[in-house]
Amino acid sequence: MKNSKLNLTMIMDLYELTMANGIFNSDMRDTVSYFDMFFRRVPDKGGYAIMAGLEQLIEYMENLKFEPEDIEYLRSLNLFCDEFIDYLKDFKFCCDVWAVPEGTVIFPHEPIITVRGPAMQALMLETMLLVTINHQSLIATKANRIVRAAQGRPVMEFGARRAHGNGAAYYGARAAIIGGCTGTSCLLTGKDFGVKVSGTMAHSWVQLFDDEYTAFKTYAEKYPDSCLLLVDTYNVLKSGIPNAIKVFDEVLKPLGKRPLGIRIDSGDITYITKKARKMLDDAGYSDCKICVSNSLDEYLIRDMIFQGAKVDTYGVGERLITASSEAVFGGVYKLSAVEKNGEIIPKIKISENAAKITIPGVKIPWRLYDRETGKAIADVITTGSEKISSDEPYEIFDPNHTWKRKVVDNFVAKKLQVKIYEKGKLIYEIPKVKDIAKHCKEQVDSLWDEVTRFENPHTYYVDLSEELWNLRHSLLNKLRIKE
């Protein structure tokens, strides 16, 4: 959590330290390595994902320190030499880190984060890097799908009670805001990140009173400027809305106040909201908002709108905060190159599964934008030494079907990654969550509608430069011959 005194350095898998210990005791101690984080598949078979979690990764790297009790525990495992234990005792982070800014639209196989530094240190980042980026990117991506389904209607994140632990509630709400939610019910997220919080009452409030009318009346008297009543504790149409209207008339109207709205948390939302809207309008409360909740997701929201539901705002909980339709984001962290005697040596991982064959070497991901429309045309991954000029036509091609080629012109090429750390020193200014959310909206708006479809979206092109494609295939051929 923000400003937490809890030291998360030891959120590591054991093999990270056993490998680091092995490197420490070999002639590779000073080896400089390059690692990339990337993902292979968009959640929910979608067309794109949203990058999130970088701020928390930075917090982790800023506070990397092995406490005395950590050192004693590691010593007790009898796996590490005394010299390596001493190295950890005086650990000083000294890596370079590049990352795609939070809120940016991202696609499979392109490097989201690149780490350059001593192999021992770069290895140690794997677990926390993946935990942080995978979780928040998953939730931000799910939130964005839900927000788009709502077609401009506000979506509030209401999921803290159903999250997989307090950290998931706290950071999940942050990611949901990045993805486009207008607020959260989680107070700590609101406090720490400066985002809007929202909430009114639970069914227990109504049940505590002798009758629904008294519960509503008491609440309206306490909160006349933000009166939103939960009307489905007993019967929405027969008691909830009639009692709400009565309280609006008797409590708010004499004060010159207008109700904020009503909330419905059960039943056939489409049918009930149509009836509720008419009842409120007939009573003179056409400005009274109707908020609905109840295990919503992008598909239910889309269907409700299609069926003519009269909904002004949505409160989405469990299916957002847990991304229940897709359990994991699937990001991985792989070695891409090492430096020896000033020379960069690209590395590749080969698999029988073609999707798991990595892209070797030091790389730069670029995004090409159409100058006239501002829409994203394609992403291109080049070698670290290449540049894409916006002043001349550029040929892109499908890395798997190389005969599929296209020449693009009248475009602007932008690097996706920015440098975050220089030799262990933070050089990046962390933006506020509200600014990240604004950036996210601009990013999604830069995509063609075909890419944002829920079902069978158009596959956005992530291509390799000719030089990088040749490098990859030369390594594949070289290693296959050795086999």
Task: Please describe what each predicted stretch is.
Residues K2-T31, F35, K45-G46, A283, ...:
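Gly/Ser/Thr/Ala-enriched C-terminal appendages of enzymes
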Residues G53-Q56, L138, K432, I436:
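Short amphipathic alpha-helical segments
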Residues E72-Y73, T141-R145, G159, T452-T459:
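Short coil/turn segments at secondary-structure boundaries
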